Amino acid sequence: MFDSKQLSVYFICGTQDIPKNKSIEQVLKEALEAGITLYQFREKGPNALKGEKKKQLALKLKQLCHSYHVPMIVNDDVQLAQEINADGIHVGQDDMEIQQFASQFKNKIIGLSVGNLKEYQQSDLSKVDYIGVGPMYTTSSKDDASKPVGPSMISQLRLYIHDFPIVAIGGINETNVQPIVDEGADGISVISAITRSTNIDKTVKYFLRYFT
């Protein structure tokens, strides 16, 4: 069962985000031990794992997440999410229509990216558990990231969807999280703030203070 508190500190990463001196398992384990509330496996880019290698890694990471009682979401790959029985799926505006697969994800978490009011108005949220809003700030983690919308987009969306779970994403770090909290987000999604942190435990606990 989805709870908006699971969005508090939502960690996203794939092998492409991990520093060369670490493994994805090591980084995720540190983040889980520190208290992340949700994990999304997002394997993208020219050197991304594919096929069986991607599936085996996803299974390993799901098992790791479950050992800490944290759900694991798969980004964009509906087939993989089904094959590994992931806890949910997150899709973007240009990905598969949610109505096409929602029936296969009953009792699972479904997330949708929403970048602005126009995208919100074009989106059917009837099968969606939460929306990821952003990018908040300039980000280097996504090559195809659009122009930042800023934290104010959260409060603009709140005028239409008062209690709907919203997680902020894009360029978020320890120095700029406060405005996102002030605007009413239920949590933050981060990639590099954790993968590039010199002290993952300290970073995650810092973020958690804002949402607990």
From Swiss-Prot:
**Gene Ontology MF term list:** magnesium ion binding; thiamine-phosphate diphosphorylase activity
Family matches, as InterPro entries: Aldolase_TIM, ThiamineP_synth_sf, ThiamineP_synth_TenI, TMP_synthase
Protein name as annotated: Thiamine-phosphate synthase
Please list the residues that bind 2-[(2R,5Z)-2-carboxy-4-methylthiazol-5(2H)-ylidene]ethyl phosphate: 139-141, 171, 191-192
The record lists Mg(2+) as bound by 76, 95
| Cofactor(s) recorded in Swiss-Prot or TrEMBL | Mg(2+)
Q: What is its EC number?
A: 2.5.1.3
Q: Which reaction does it catalyse?
A: 2-[(2R,5Z)-2-carboxy-4-methylthiazol-5(2H)-ylidene]ethyl phosphate + 4-amino-2-methyl-5-(diphosphooxymethyl)pyrimidine + 2 H(+) = thiamine phosphate + CO2 + diphosphate; 2-(2-carboxy-4-methylthiazol-5-yl)ethyl phosphate + 4-amino-2-methyl-5-(diphosphooxymethyl)pyrimidine + 2 H(+) = thiamine phosphate + CO2 + diphosphate; 4-methyl-5-(2-phosphooxyethyl)-thiazole + 4-amino-2-methyl-5-(diphosphooxymethyl)pyrimidine + H(+) = thiamine phosphate + diphosphate
Fetch the Gene3D superfamilies from UniProt.
Aldolase class I
| A biological process from GO | thiamine biosynthetic process
Family in the record: Belongs to the thiamine-phosphate synthase family.
Q: Its domain of life?
A: Bacteria
Q: Which HAMAP family match?
A: TMP_synthase
Q: Which residues bind 4-amino-2-methyl-5-(diphosphooxymethyl)pyrimidine?
A: 40-44, 75, 113, 142
> Which cellular component terms (GO) are annotated to the entry?
cytoplasm
- What binding details are noted for the cofactor? Binds 1 Mg(2+) ion per subunit.
Locate the transmembrane regions by residue number.
none
Keywords, A to Z, come to: Magnesium, Metal-binding, Thiamine biosynthesis, Transferase
Report the protein's function: Condenses 4-methyl-5-(beta-hydroxyethyl)thiazole monophosphate (THZ-P) and 2-methyl-4-amino-5-hydroxymethyl pyrimidine pyrophosphate (HMP-PP) to form thiamine monophosphate (TMP).
> Which organism is the protein's source?
Staphylococcus epidermidis (strain ATCC 35984 / DSM 28319 / BCRC 17069 / CCUG 31568 / BM 3577 / RP62A)
Report the pathway entry: Cofactor biosynthesis; thiamine diphosphate biosynthesis; thiamine phosphate from 4-amino-2-methyl-5-diphosphomethylpyrimidine and 4-methyl-5-(2-phosphoethyl)-thiazole: step 1/1
